[in-house]
Design a protein with these regions (language model features):
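Outer-membrane beta-barrel "beta-signal"
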Residues: 136-143, 277-289
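Transmembrane beta-strands of outer-membrane beta-barrel pores
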Residues: 38-46, 69-73, 78-84, 102, ...
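Outer-membrane beta-barrel transmembrane domain signature
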Residues: 42-44, 173-252, 263-264
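Outer-membrane beta-barrel translocator domains and adjoining extracellular loop/strand segments
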Residues: 44-52, 87-91, 119-124, 151-153, ...
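Outer-envelope beta-barrel architecture signal
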Residues: 28-34, 61, 70-74, 103-107, ...
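Outer-membrane pore/translocation modules
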Residues: 93-194, 260
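Short glycine/proline- and aromatic-enriched beta-strand/turn motifs that initiate or cap beta-hairpins
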Residues: 21-84
Length: 289
């Protein structure tokens, strides 16, 4: 208990010290980094008039490896063979992410394929052949980038020395594909592809403590406008993304824990709303070479 109080006291003193100090953002001398991550990923899909309330991935644990050089980063993740239900087929998950950070900007690209979900019926799991495919290309600009660095909290290639925050503005193109091969979600019995354009915005704030400990809180949101290529009808796609990152950013190595929730609504009509909920917990280690 005494150690806990001492730890909180030193964090508070470090926070007050860094607010007053006003130190700039440091760029590590070592430009190349290796990245190792463990991802606990929970994707839930809910569809109107389906045979399930919601379904989820059967393999929620991924491992990842990646790297970074200069302003460019990439990560590859693969699902480990641990299942929620051993009687059902394992989920198939593939995800590739890349990030690029020119001054004050963040460009993000991703491709993800998620096959085979399960849902619960009277404490038993049932397999469903739902497939979700998505690709995203987004850009976000930080209005206050002299003292605030998004990448310092999430990519760990900068060291932010002062508590600061910034408004974020940008946009995104998203291609979302949904298919229920076994017709458990009848509306998606035929594959539906939705190209989506969305303005994006939010706010992010990083609290800096002593010894390069940090805490970042971020809230992003967007209102997307999509087109269902199968029915030629417009789809309203609002999305909210709260994020939290906590970690330590040293000169040769760094680590963080990131919690993120991504909630997407698909408004096909006033009475027809489906949803995709993606919650993840990531532990990232970065070694600068």
């Amino acid at each position: 208990m005494i150690r806990c109080k001492y730890f909180l006291f030193t964090l508070l003193c470090g926070l007050l010290f860094n607010i007053a100090l006003g130190a700039p953002i440091e760029v590590p001398e070592k430009k190349f980094s290796l990245r190792f991550s463990t991802l606990f990923n929970f994707i839930n899909f809910s569809a109107k008039d389906s045979y399930f309330d919601n379904c989820q991935l059967n393999q929620p644990i991924d491992i990842g490896i990646g790297g970074g050089i200069g302003d460019f980063f990439w990560d590859f993740t693969y699902a480990l063979p641990f299942s929620i239900d051993d009687k059902s087929s394992p989920s198939e998950v593939f995800e590739l992410n890349t990030n690029f950070y020119p001054k004050g900007l963040w460009f993000h690209g991703m491709v993800g394929v998620y096959n085979r979900f399960v849902f619960s019926v009277e404490k038993e799991y049932v397999e469903t052949k739902v497939q979700i495919f998505e690709t995203r290309i987004s850009g976000i600009y930080s209005l206050e980038n002299e003292y605030f660095s998004w990448r310092a909290a999430y990519e760990l290639d900068r060291i932010q020395k002062k508590t600061a925050g910034s408004w974020l503005v940008g946009g995104e193109f998203r291609l979302l594909g949904l298919h229920s091969k076994d017709q458990m979600a009848p509306y998606y019995a035929k594959r539906r592809m939705l190209p989506i354009l969305a303005p994006k915005g939010g706010y992010s704030h990083t609290f800096i403590f002593s010894n390069d400990w940090f805490l970042n809180l971020t809230l992003l949101g967007e209102i997307g406008f999509g087109l269902d290529l199968l029915s030629d009808k417009f789809v309203l796609v609002p999305e909210s993304i709260p994020k939290l990152a906590f970690g330590k950013n040293g000169k040769s190595w760094a680590w963080n824990m990131v919690i993120q929730c991504d909630y997407t609504l698909l408004g096909h009509s006033i009475k027809h709303w489906d949803s995709i909920y993606d919650a993840s917990f990531v532990v990232l280690f970065v070694w600068r070479i």
